């Protein structure tokens, strides 16, 4: 099964579980969790089931396209179910079956790995899912989002697409993966991997990036003053990515690092609080949609 078919299979499976299928969010981010589809929508009481592929940029992991397993950008398939269904683990195992992986024929383990994202003020109970000794998925029950208590609890399933595809295709080098017939992962991503790595480690202008961080930070606050949560959160993501570029460049000292993470976290918490307030003003409209569905049933 090639990567494209794998993605289509997961999309079809989760759409049948009443998930909205969305497209990748168009701002740089380090993980699918950072998308507003997860970070903001898991706040408050409104139901939310969603699935999407998220390209995730980790500048420090760039290896010029020469390392078989380390990438500047990898891909996650993200699933959020809010509130978490009681059978969420079985739903996940069924998704593996849809991919041709029979849990009864493989060693599948849920290894405790509680999750935390300090820069977003998020935390939860979690497990790594290991398939025959390789981690393929992170499974998390959100307890805190943007510093706010998660109520109801959302379940997050994050598949590492490259790792899962490497297992399914039995490839040791990610660049050898078949994306679709006639095109490998390397055909598509080797050049951007090299160029982004070169930019990150050799070309990026640290002084300019420091200025950008401060500019994005101010603009996030300015948007929040106007109760514009989504534009503000876009600038939080830009702050986070800019910080990651500076960190990868070695431009931030150990003592400065904590301060910069704190600044991003402070903005994320402001966005979380403002998102809740704005949805509350609207009367949590998706909650009403759910109630209407129950009445029709």
From Swiss-Prot:
GO cellular component, one term: cytosol
Transmembrane helix among keywords: no
Keyword Manganese: no
Record keywords: Aminoacyl-tRNA synthetase, ATP-binding, Cytoplasm, Ligase, Nucleotide-binding, Protein biosynthesis
Documented EC number(s): 6.1.1.14
Group of enzyme by EC: ligase
Sample GO molecular function, one term: ATP binding
Annotated catalysed reactions: tRNA(Gly) + glycine + ATP = glycyl-tRNA(Gly) + AMP + diphosphate
Cellular compartment(s): Cytoplasm
Gene3D superfamilies: Bira Bifunctional Protein, Domain 2 (3.30.930.10), Class II aaRS and biotin synthetases, domain 2 (1.20.58.180)
Top-level taxon of the source organism: Bacteria
Subunit structure: Tetramer of two alpha and two beta subunits.
Family, per entry: Belongs to the class-II aminoacyl-tRNA synthetase family.
Annotated protein name in UniProt: Glycine--tRNA ligase alpha subunit
Gene: glyQ
């Amino acid at each position: 099964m090639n990567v494209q078919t794998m993605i289509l299979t997961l999309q079809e499976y989760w759409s049948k579980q009443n998930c909205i299928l969305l497209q990748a969010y168009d701002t740089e981010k380090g993980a699918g969790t950072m998308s507003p589809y997860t970070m903001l929508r898991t706040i408050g009481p409104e139901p939310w089931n969603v699935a999407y592929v998220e390209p995730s940029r980790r500048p420090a992991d760039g290896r010029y396209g020469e390392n078989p397993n380390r990438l500047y950008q990898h891909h996650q398939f993200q699933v959020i179910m809010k509130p978490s269904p009681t059978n969420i683990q079985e739903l996940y195992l069924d998704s593996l079956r849809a991919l041709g992986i029979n849990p009864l024929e493989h060693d599948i383990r849920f290894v405790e790995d509680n999750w935390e994202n300090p820069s977003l003020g998020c935390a939860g109970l979690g497990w790594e899912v290991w398939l025959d000794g390789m981690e393929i998925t992170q499974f998390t029950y959100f307890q805190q989002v943007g510093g706010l208590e998660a109520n109801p609890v959302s379940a997050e399933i994050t598949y590492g697409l490259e790792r899962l595809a490497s297992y399914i295709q039995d490839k040791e080098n990610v660049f050898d993966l078949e994306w679709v017939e006639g095109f490998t992962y390397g055909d598509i991503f080797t050049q951007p991997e090299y160029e982004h790595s070169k930019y990150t480690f050799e070309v990026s202008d640290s002084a300019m990036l420091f200025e950008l961080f401060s500019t994005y930070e101010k603009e996030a606050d300015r948007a929040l003053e106007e109760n514009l949560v989504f534009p503000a959160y876009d600038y939080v993501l830009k702050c986070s990515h800019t910080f990651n570029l500076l960190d990868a460049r070695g431009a931030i000292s150990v003592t400065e690092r904590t301060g910069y993470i704190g600044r991003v976290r402070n903005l994320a918490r402001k966005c979380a609080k403002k998102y809740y307030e704005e949805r509350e003003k609207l009367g949590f409209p998706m909650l009403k949609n759910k109630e209407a569905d129950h009445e029709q049933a």
